[in-house]
Amino acid sequence: MEQAVEQTVRNQQRDYIPQLYKFAQIVMATNKNAVKYATTGTPKKFWTVWKEQDTAFLGQALERYLSGKTPTEQDRCMVSLFHPSRVLELIRYFILFDANVKKICRYQQYFAIKEISKTVQKADERGNRQSGVIWHTQGSGKSLTMVMLAKYLLMELAPCNPKVVVVTDRKELDRQISTTFAHTRLN
């Protein structure tokens, strides 16, 4: 697996075949039992795994595409990441540039944003909406999750003319999130 990632990263460099990757949005290194994905230009240390959390989606897609065969990890990730509806959604909402560095969401960010979106769009009989909390560890991509969430909501709910307000509890977090939004040009 590591060799496949290294080769894919190497092949994007000037002395190899960068033209092959010119229009690619998502790249994947895989063998039967392991998969890692990234965007073009992503250094090896930032390649990551995808863990499908929508088991109904995965089960239906695997049944459709494999019909009776035992799926491998490669099969599961190919279906999870490259099902037509999913890959288009990932490209549209979940790839961004952070200070001119192309980034794609991690699976945790994707599924958190999808759940938040459902909650934001759902109201009770009096028009009230639920609130919620997403817990992230330090360095897990909270700022980028907020940027991707804002992008998703602003694009998905465009007819409603949504506004996004980010509230922080510390000046340092305020500076950090402001910088992240500015670097992604979503400010």
Regions found by a protein language model. Give the residues of each.
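ATP-dependent helicase/translocase motor core
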Residues: 1-168, 172-187
